[in-house]
């Protein structure tokens, strides 16, 4: 599992994530937006509040995605 250095919200439900190994990925999280509480992330204001929690990214409503998940999408 790689530690996340930075995360930046992009348009169309994407995140720009930089990992500790300096790899950068654009992660499309739209595939999660029809699953349970992740539906809340359809709100652009909420999705833009993403923050780095080290080995995951998290939103104020306590939803999170691990760095492993972000590397797979």
Residue ranges and their predicted role:
Residues 1-73:
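Motif-centric detector for short Cys/His coordination patterns
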């Amino acid at each position: 599992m790689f530690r996340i250095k930075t995360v930046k919200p992009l348009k169309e439900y994407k995140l720009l994530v930089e990992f500790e190994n300096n790899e950068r990925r654009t992660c499309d999280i739209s595939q999660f937006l029809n699953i349970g509480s992740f539906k809340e992330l359809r709100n652009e204001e909420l999705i833009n509040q993403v923050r780095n929690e080290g080995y995951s990214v998290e939103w104020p409503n306590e939803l999170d995605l691990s760095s492993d998940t972000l590397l797979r999408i």
